[in-house]
Amino acid sequence: MRRTLCLTVSLTVLALSQAAHAQTASPDAAPDIADARIATSVAPLVVTANRTALAPDKVGQSVTVLTLPQIQADQETVVADILDRTPGVIVTRSGGVGEPTLLNIRGAASDQTMVLVDGVKFDDPSAADGGYDFSDLLVSDVSRIEVLRGPQSTLYGSQAIGGVVNIVTADATRPLQGDAQVEGGSYGTFYAKGGIGGLDGPLSWRLAANDYTTTGISAFDERLGGHEADGYSNQGVSGRLGYEFSPDVSVDLRGLFVSARSDFDGFSTPSGNFGDDSEYGTTREAIAYAGLNFGLLDDRLKNRLALQYTTTDRDNYDPTDAPVTKTFDGVGTNARAEYQGLLAIAPGWQGVFGAEHEQSTIAVSTPAFNDPASPAFFPPGSPPVSAHVSTDSGYGQLQAEVIKGLNLTGGLRYDDTSSYGGHVTGQASAAWSLNGGDTVLRASWGQGFKAPSLYELYSEFGSTNLRPEQATGWDAGIEQHFWDRRIDLQATYFSRDTNNLIVFVDCFDPANPRCAFGGFFANVDRARAQGVELSGAIRPLRGLEITANYTRTDATDRSPGATSGNSLPRIPKDTANAAVSYIWPIKLTTALAVRYAGKSFDDIANTMPLKAYTLVDLRAVYPLTSHLEVYGRIENLADAHYETTFQYGNLGRAAYAGLRVTF
C-alpha cells in the first residue's frame, strides 16, 4: 500500500511533466538540470550560524552549506552518507542501511550534535543518551543542508556541543512544479520518491513521499560468521503550507512522518550471545510545526511565533518466541513553544533574540525482560521509565559590521531546567572580508552544554543529581579565493574541552544501593578534541571540478585513570575526501570520489581496533532532455572490507541506476 502511494505520486509527477513539456516554455520554466550543476560554485547564504540569512563572508563560525545540485550529484539516498563527506564529520553505522547510524562532529559524541529539520529540533528523548539516530533519515525531499561546527548552545541550547546539522526540505517557487525519482540496484534495493507543489500569489504548498526497501546484508560481520541478511524498509511523507495575508503577516505549517522497519543483529535474547540475531525493530517519527510570522516597525522588527512537536516511537521484537515477544517499547516526545525576533538596528547592525519553552517526555519499558513467563525474563527485571522535564530559555545576540568588511557577533543564553536548574552559555565570533571578498579571516569562541537525558536521570541506572555536560571551544581560519574564484581554499584550526561527561559506571557492591542493577550514570569524564580542517576546490576548465578535504582530529580522554590520554571511541585521527567530476560536451557528467578514514578504536580502553579503509565510488549522469535524466553509480568499487563499529559489517561493492525528472 505504501509503495503504491509513492509510485502513484511519482507517476503523477511524470505525467504532469510530460504535459508541461508539450507547451511552449515560459520565462519561469524549470531550470536545465545540467546547467544547474555548473552553478554549484556560487556561494549560498548561511542561515544556521546566526538564525538569519547572511552572506558567507559575514559569518565567523565554521560552516559547510550543501545545495540541491551538490546533494543530487552525490546520488546518495541516506543523509548520513552525504554528511560523511564533509569536513570534521564522522559517521558510524552498525551494519548496512537502516542500522543504527551515529554522527560525530569534531570528535564530539553523537548525542552532542543538534539536529534540526526545517529548523525544528529533532532528537529522541526515549534514547538512553537522548541523541538522534540518523538511520531513518533519507534524502527524500531534502534540498539543502548546513553543517555548523563548534559549540553553538547560545542560539540552540542543549546538545549543540559538537555543532548543528540543519536539514531543509524543498519549497515551491513557481505556480506548479514537481519532481520524481526511481532507483534500483544491489542488495535488492528499490527507492522511489516524488514531490509536487506550487506558489500562486499568497499561497504556497508542497507534498512529497518516498519508499525505500532493501534486503541488505548481515549487520554482524560476515567474516565473523554473519550470514542472515538484515533487511530494511522506510516510507515517508512530508508537506508544507504557507499563506501570506499581507506583505508583513504570514502563516507556515509543516509536517513530516516516517515509518521504518529494520532487522538487526546484536545480543540475542535470552542467551545474550553476540552475533546473528532474528530480532527486528519498527520506528515511527513525526514532526509538526505551526508558525506565525509578522513584521513591526515598518518591517524592521521581524517576529516569529511557533509551536513545534516531535515524537519518536520505537519497538523491538524477538520473533523466535511464540507468540512474538516485544523486547523494547519506547516513546519520546518534544513539545516546544517559541518566539524569535530579528531587529534591524541600523545598516549593518542587527539583533536576534528569543524565548522558548520546551517539555520532553519519555516512556520506556522492556516487556520481555519483565515477564516471568517470557524466555527473555531476567530477574529482577527492568522497571519501566516514565518521566518528563521542562526547560525555559531566553537568548540574545548582536551582529554588527563595525567597519567595512569586519563583522562581529556576540550573544548570551540562559536555560532554566526543572531537573538541574539554571545554565548560562555565551559565544562570540568575527569575520573579516578583505580583497573584495577573496580573503576572509574567521574566528569564533563558544560554549556548549548537553542536559542529562531523561533515561540518565530517571531510569534504574539514573540519578537526579546529574549535571549538564559542558564544553568550551574555539576555532580560527582563513578562506582564500584565486583565479577569479576558480580556486577556493579553506583552513581552520579548532580546539574544544568538555567536562562533566556522563558515563555508565560499573558497580557490583551489594552494600551499595546504587549497584543494585550493576552500575549507574555519573558525571566523571573529561575530554579534549583539537585539530585542523582543510578543504579546497579548483575549476580549471568549464565543466571540470576537483574538490578535496582533510581533517586531523586528536580526540582524547582527559579523565584521571587508566584510560587518560587514550583516543575517544570511533574517532579516526585522519579522514580525507576527494572527488573529480567533469561535464562532457555531450552533457554527460562523470565523477570519481574517494574517501579515506584512518584507524580508530571502538572502546575507550583502546583494545578493540577498527582498521583504516579507503572507499572509491564512480558516478555518471546523462540528461535525456532538459528535465529528464538517467544516472548510475558504483559504490565501494574495490569491494573493500571495513568496519566503523566493531564486529559490524558494511556494504561491499554495489551498483545502482535510476531516473530523475523535474518540471
Map each language-model feature to its residues.
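N-terminal periplasmic accessory domains that precede
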Residues: 79-82, 100-104, 113-116, 132-137, ...
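Membrane-embedded beta-barrel scaffold of Gram-negative outer-membrane proteins
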Residues: 203, 210, 300-318, 359-363, ...
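Conserved C-terminal beta-signal and adjacent last beta-strands/turns
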Residues: 2, 6-8, 197-200, 208, ...
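N-terminal Sec signal peptide and the immediately downstream disordered periplasmic leader
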Residues: 1-76, 80-86, 243, 288, ...
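Short acidic/polar hinge/loop motifs at secondary-structure boundaries
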Residues: 121-149
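Extracytoplasmic beta-strand/coil segments of soluble accessory domains associated
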Residues: 48, 80, 84-121, 143
